[in-house]
């Protein structure tokens, strides 16, 4: 196998030679997971974009990967790609695999060079380039990103971009162009003389665009309190920030102690500028460069000192640490049918996870397998997993790894497990205590590079103390069944499970259903689906008008064309195209040769189809006496939808609703022309409700919402058949007369009316929402007489959602007054979510459940002859007359028997609990060889709930529900236990979608191993990633010393809590936000303090419309001050959402940090995706200030808290008086008087708090004398 070269010791000239060789490229064999045959390709490094590309020919790149996304470069034949292709003839020393991506499941590029020397060169070069990319300055990253944009429109890697291409690119990077005039004006401003920009001009255009959009942020540095005063900010180079000013900024605003050294400040500026012409003793930043610095990762909010390992903190017993832990580590997705993979173990270990789970079952040939038992998840070999653990356990962290074994194997296969552990892991395996006489667990330092086995252990007399993790309902029938779909008249496969006399089923498994083979399209009809084919156009003039309008909008490119049926010659066609500023036409003639229709423009070159003719002239020139021309851009047919079955030209809204109400299936849809307007509406069914959405016309485009542009309605439908239109709903069932006849049923009136929202329209959302209640997230003081003043926690009733971000509501004595919508959260929405959680709480399919059948209301019968081409069928016949039967089928007769028997026992109301228990009873035998490997993590269950007298050699495992019960009832007992013993908590069985529970309360009580699903990109996994970003990402974080104090209470009474600090945050702007789907993002930011219940609080900004590239919230956005009780155990979380066309929030990016790890000042917040992977150049700019609360100020904050609580009580009492006539009386006047007095007093207290914050800030902002 090829060994990695230590590139750190290579001289610079050798590094340059290696990089040059990679840039020139190497012919290699590429192994593709989707292809059984490897292919020869040229693989090369594109230095300008920092991408590895592979291509068959020089002018056509087949694929590429960003070098910053590389997670591992693995030498040898160590990927499945080599196995699939049976790469026998390629030597292992010439092979390597690049693993890359930003999701949990990584992509692979497996390569084989022709020589060992080439392989070494590539392994070394990739490592060098990856190191350089990860340490590149932000201006360098911006230049690379700009190159990618140019190359994305032209793979020839030219050094320029046209105005038309620029207009195409900007929406793709999340910026809405108001019109071609906007771009032309910008080009004039940067001095471009024509509609073609060089790369340097493109770079200037980008800088000018970003600066103009965000220069208002710099007003923050024109205030008297600023540590330096900026000059003119009208233009990017209108003024500058000089060395001494920058030092003042770093020292006083950013509180960077290293900035006391002027040389370090000079070095920071010089490296950031990266301009040899400005490498002087007195460097400066132009104002646009200063603004870019504020957004850059060089100015990150994260304190980089926590990237280093604190070795002094690694000498405590293991029980004093939080330990990064994974649940069902082998899974790459959900718990029912996802893939099990050794790569999942590698991904978790290299992410710093230190406790992983092995779910072991008897396998073939006497060797165990790992998978999620009793489900359809795939199986992997135990031996392969142990080898992967050996190779990757200590790559990221050298501290111990705990293997949590869930044992289902026979004794014989357990012996094999013990043998493999010892042979493969060798000296890594911990087989005896570090200290024989110790009375506590060893420290992480004592256990470096050791692997610990957590497994059941035989006692001194051979007895077993077991801990069987909760696997509720795992032995009841569950698996895939076919269900008969009466709409599509076909069998669809669903995952089903029985629990509590109910059969639950998930959504249909579309990829598993056999599809009818696609019929080959006859050559003569190939052009029908092409957008350049316009069928019969009214006249020659109409065709010319279409071309003229298209060319006026797109830049009049020669060769722009369309094809139409000939007006005068049957079977012939007309090619209309744009050349030299006018439209020209050519007749496409047809002739019959040997019974086959041929088409031609010139007599000497005929084609079998119109499609073949057009494809030829798009690649080769059309030559005639006057000109040579190649067909370029097709003019799309504006009306291809008219022939589609889902389109209705004259259908009213009421008629559309009536049709949709008869199809009780999410994804049913139609599109109709709206009466009296040049717009359309899509009517669809989602979540059981009928909804509408308007589609407007903008020139030749169809626009859904404000920025989702489509060339045609056909393209719109095709897109949303593959992507979610509303929440998770895709278009699936075109509503046609045939479908209505097939599914002939009564109208479902309930589907039309929805208590939460009846009509979904991006432009016309019903503003009247009576009786809605919202909760204030923060204090707000009215700025006008028609606005509400309220305190955090206040309930505002009878809310009416007005447009523009201002809503109306009732609070106290003030009726229907305005307040900002981003200061509140909708309680009713939260209640609906909580209700949904309650419904799925005990469902065996959890949130994946799409339907439930109560088996007590059915009789089950077999279909002896089968049905609908399935041999093994059973039918649930309803006991209630009139209800339709439900038909199921299996693949095997054994499955049919098992399901039929289980359902029959329920429907006959037989008590089979005792029989089932006997049938599924487990043999708890343990192999001595495996038992002997258990040293410290011996599970116990006999006295698991008794937390007294912990044994440090034992570990107690709790399902999340049991752990939550203990936390609520005896949090202090659990904390005391965890100071000496270990606990592991894992998700409940109902989380089949692999969702995660909130780990915080368990961390608060000292639980070390709070196991989460690493493959799930949710909030709690992101918090987990944030916690373990401390201490150099070792996977071990020392719990605060205060938690080991005898006086520490993880859940103190309110009277015992003290505010220790305040955190003030202001969101100023963002850059390079990611883009979802076709629409340009309309972003807003949610800022949240995550911690104990008494610390949790959040705030939302307003929505910025149609700008995800450079949105700004300053200067209108106000500062928000959070009160923090325990800064050591709280997180600051930023989440960026986009508001979609239905006013629903969609996750875009996040950044989550432990509060102890953030820095003050004007800070960049680098954004991450759901999996906490960096997003290129994406960042927020925020102002952040932390201030400890002095003991003398605690009384003031305590008074504020008490008044807020009292105001909430008074407001609720007043609401009751005003909504219940029988309660009206004299008491109301007293309540009103007290409410008003308290409100004034609260405002005074709040002003006093704010004044102290301002005074503190001014004292920190003095100039150097």
Curated annotation (Swiss-Prot):
Any one GO CC term of the record: plasma membrane
Residues bearing PTM Phosphotyrosine: 753, 759, 1197, 1217, 1245
Gene Ontology molecular function: phosphatidylcholine phospholipase C activity; phosphatidylinositol-4,5-bisphosphate phospholipase C activity; phospholipase C activity; phosphorylation-dependent protein binding; phosphotyrosine residue binding; protein tyrosine kinase binding; scaffold protein binding
GO biological process: antifungal innate immune response; B cell differentiation; B cell receptor signaling pathway; calcium-mediated signaling; cell activation; cellular response to calcium ion; cellular response to lectin; follicular B cell differentiation
The SH3 domain, residue ranges: 769-829
Domain C2 span(s) in chain numbering: 1038-1169
Record field: transmembrane: none
Catalytic activity as recorded in UniProt: a 1,2-diacyl-sn-glycero-3-phospho-(1D-myo-inositol-4,5-bisphosphate) + H2O = 1D-myo-inositol 1,4,5-trisphosphate + a 1,2-diacyl-sn-glycerol + H(+)
Location relative to the cell: Membrane raft
Sequence ranges assigned to domain SH2 in this UniProt record: 532-635, 646-735
UniProt keyword terms in alphabetical order: Calcium, Hydrolase, Lipid degradation, Lipid metabolism, Membrane, Phosphoprotein, Repeat, SH2 domain, SH3 domain, Transducer
PH domain residues: 1-131
EC nos: 3.1.4.11
Function recorded in the entry: The production of the second messenger molecules diacylglycerol (DAG) and inositol 1,4,5-trisphosphate (IP3) is mediated by activated phosphatidylinositol-specific phospholipase C enzymes. It is a crucial enzyme in transmembrane signaling.
Assembly and interaction partners: Part of a complex composed of EEIG1, TNFRSF11A/RANK, PLCG2, GAB2, TEC and BTK; complex formation increases in the presence of TNFSF11/RANKL. Interacts (via SH2 domain) with CSF1R (tyrosine phosphorylated). Interacts constitutively with THEMIS2.
Protein name: 1-phosphatidylinositol 4,5-bisphosphate phosphodiesterase gamma-2
Provenance organism: Mus musculus (Mouse)
């Amino acid at each position: 196998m090829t060994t990695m070269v230590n590139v750190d010791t290579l001289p610079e000239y050798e590094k340059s030679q290696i990089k040059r060789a990679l840039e020139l490229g190497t012919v290699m064999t590429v192994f593709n997971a989707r292809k059984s045959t490897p292919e020869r390709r040229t693989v090369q490094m594109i230095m300008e974009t920092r991408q590895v590309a592979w291509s068959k020919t020089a002018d056509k790149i087949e694929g590429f990967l960003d070098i910053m996304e590389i997670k591992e470069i693995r030498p040898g034949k160590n990927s499945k790609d080599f196995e699939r292709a049976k790469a026998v003839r390629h030597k292992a020393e010439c092979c390597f695999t690049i693993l890359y991506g930003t999701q949990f499941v990584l992509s692979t590029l497996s390569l084989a060079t022709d020589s060992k020397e080439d392989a070494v060169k590539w392994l070394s070069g990739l490592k060098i380039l990856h190191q350089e990319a990860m340490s590149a300055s932000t201006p360098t990253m911006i230049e690379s990103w700009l190159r990618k944009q140019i190359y994305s429109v032209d793979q020839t890697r030219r050094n320029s971009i046209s105005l038309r291409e620029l207009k195409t690119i900007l929406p793709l990077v999340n910026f809405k162009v108001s019109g071609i005039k906007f771009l032309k004006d910008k080009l004039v401003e940067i001095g471009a003389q024509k509609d073609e920009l060089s790369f340097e001009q493109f770079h200037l255009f980008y800088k000018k665009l970003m600066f103009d959009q965000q220069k208002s942020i710099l007003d923050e540095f024109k205030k008297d309190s600023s540590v330096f005063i900026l000059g003119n900010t009208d233009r990017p180079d209108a003024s500058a920030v000089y060395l001494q000013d920058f030092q003042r900024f770093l020292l006083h605003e950013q509180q960077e102690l290293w900035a006391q050294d002027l040389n370090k400040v000079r070095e920071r500026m010089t490296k950031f500028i990266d301009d040899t012409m400005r490498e002087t003793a007195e460097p400066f930043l132009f104002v646009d460069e200063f603004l870019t610095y504020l957004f850059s990762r060089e100015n990150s909010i994260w304190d980089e000192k926590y990237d280093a390992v604190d070795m002094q903190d690694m000498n405590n017993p293991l029980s004093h640490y939080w330990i990064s832990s994974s649940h069902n580590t082998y899974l790459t997705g959900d718990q029912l049918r996802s893939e099990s993979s050794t790569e999942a173990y590698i991904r978790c270990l290299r992410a710093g996870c230190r406790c992983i789970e092995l779910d072991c079952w008897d396998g073939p040939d006497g060797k165990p397998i790992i998978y999620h038992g009793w489900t359809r998840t795939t199986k992997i070999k135990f031996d392969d997993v142990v080898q992967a653990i050996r190779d990757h356990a200590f790559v990221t962290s050298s501290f111990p790894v705990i293997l949590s074994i869930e044992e289902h194997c026979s004794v014989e296969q357990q012996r094999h497990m013990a043998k493999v552990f010892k042979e493969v892991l060798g000296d890594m395996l911990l087989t005896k205590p570090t200290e024989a006489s110790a009375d506590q667990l060893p420290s992480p330092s004592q256990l470096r590079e050791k692997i610990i086995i957590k497994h059941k252990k035989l006692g001194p007399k051979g007895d077993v103390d077991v801990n069987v993790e909760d696997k509720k309902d795992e032995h009841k029938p569950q698996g895939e069944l076919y269900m008969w779909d009466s709409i599509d008249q076909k069998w669809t496969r669903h995952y089903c499970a029985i629990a509590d006399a109910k059969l639950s089923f998930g959504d249909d498994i579309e990829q598993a259903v056999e599809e009818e083979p696609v019929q080959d399209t006859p050559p003569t009809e190939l052009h029908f689906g092409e957008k350049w084919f316009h069928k019969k156009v009214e006249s020659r003039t109409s065709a010319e008008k279409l071309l003229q309008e298209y060319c006026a909008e797109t830049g009049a490119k020669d060769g722009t064309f369309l094809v139409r049926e000939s007006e005068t010659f049957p079977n012939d066609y007309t090619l209309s195209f744009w050349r030299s500023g006018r439209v020209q036409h050519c007749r496409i003639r047809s002739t019959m040769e040997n019974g086959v229709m041929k088409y031609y423009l010139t007599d000497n070159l005929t084609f079998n189809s119109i499609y073949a003719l057009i494809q030829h002239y798009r690649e080769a020139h059309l030559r005639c006496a006057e000109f040579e021309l190649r067909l370029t851009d097709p003019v799309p047919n504006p009306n291809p939808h008219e022939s589609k079955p889902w389109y209705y030209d004259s259908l009213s809204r009421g008629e559309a609703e009536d049709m949709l109400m008869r199809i009780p299936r999410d994804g049913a849809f139609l599109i109709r022309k709206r009466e009296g307007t040049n717009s359309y509406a899509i009517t669809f069914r989602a979540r059981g409700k009928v909804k509408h959405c308007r589609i407007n016309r903008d020139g030749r485009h169809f626009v859904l919402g404000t920025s989702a542009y489509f060339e045609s309605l056909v393209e719109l439908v095709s897109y949303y058949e593959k992507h979610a239109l509303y929440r998770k709903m895709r278009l699936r069932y075109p509503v046609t007369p045939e479908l209505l006849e097939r599914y002939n049923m009564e109208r479902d009136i309930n589907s039309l009316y929805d208590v939460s929202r009846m009509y979904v329209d991006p432009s016309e959302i019903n503003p009247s929402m009576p009786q809605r209640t919202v909760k204030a997230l923060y204090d707000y003081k009215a700025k006008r007489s028609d606005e509400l003043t309220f305190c955090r926690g206040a309930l505002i009733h009878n809310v009416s959602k007005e447009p523009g971000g201002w809503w109306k509501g009732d609070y106290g004595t003030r009726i229907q007054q305005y307040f900002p919508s981003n200061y509140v959260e909708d309680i009713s929405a939260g209640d609906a979510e909580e209700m949904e959680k309650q419904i799925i709480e005990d469902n065996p399919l959890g949130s994946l459940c799409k339907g439930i059948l109560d088996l007590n209301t059915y009789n089950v019968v077999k279909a002896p002859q089968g049905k609908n081409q399935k041999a093994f069928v059973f039918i649930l016949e309803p006991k209630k007359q009139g209800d339709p039967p439900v038909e199921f089928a299996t693949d095997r007769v054994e499955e049919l028997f098992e399901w039929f028997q289980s359902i029959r026992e329920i429907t006959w109301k037989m008590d089979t609990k005792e029989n089932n228990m006997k049938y599924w009873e487990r043999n708890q035998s343990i192999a001595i060889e495996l038992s002997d490997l258990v040293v410290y993590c011996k599970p116990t269950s006999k006295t698991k709930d008794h937390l007294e007298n912990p044994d440090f050699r034992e570990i107690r495992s709790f399902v999340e529900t049991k752990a939550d019960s203990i936390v609520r009832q005896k949090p202090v007992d659990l904390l005391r236990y965890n100071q000496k013993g270990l606990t592991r908590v894992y998700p409940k069985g109902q989380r089949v979608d692999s969702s995660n529970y909130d780990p915080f309360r368990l961390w608060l009580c000292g639980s070390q191993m709070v196991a989460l699903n690493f493959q799930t990109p949710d909030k709690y996994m992101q918090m987990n990633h944030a916690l373990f970003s401390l201490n150099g990402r070792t996977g071990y974080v020392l719990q605060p010393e205060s938690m080991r104090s005898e006086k520490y209470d993880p859940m103190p009474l309110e009277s015992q809590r003290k505010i220790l600090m305040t955190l003030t945050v202001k969101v100023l702007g963002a850059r390079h936000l990611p883009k979802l789907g076709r629409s340009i993002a309309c972003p807003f930011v949610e800022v949240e303090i995550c911690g104990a219940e008494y610390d949790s609080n959040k705030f939302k900004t307003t929505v910025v419309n149609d700008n995800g590239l450079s949105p700004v919230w300053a200067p209108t956005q106000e500062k928000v001050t959070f009160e923090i009780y325990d800064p050591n155990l709280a997180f600051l979380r930023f989440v960026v959402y986009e508001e979609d066309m239905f006013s629903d929030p969609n996750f875009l990016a996040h950044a989550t940090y432990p509060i102890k790890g953030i820095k003050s000042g004007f800070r960049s917040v680098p954004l991450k995706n759901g999996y906490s992977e960096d997003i290129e150049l994406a960042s927020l700019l925020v102002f952040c200030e932390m201030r400890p609360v002095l003991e003398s100020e605690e009384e003031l904050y305590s008074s504020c808290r008490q008044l807020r609580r009292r105001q909430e009580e008074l407001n609720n009492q007043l609401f009751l008086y005003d909504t219940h006539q029988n309660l009206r009386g004299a008491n109301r006047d007293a309540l009103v008087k007290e409410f008003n007095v308290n409100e004034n007093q609260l405002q005074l207290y709040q002003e006093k708090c704010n004044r102290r914050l301002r005074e503190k800030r001014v004292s920190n902002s003095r100039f150097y004398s």
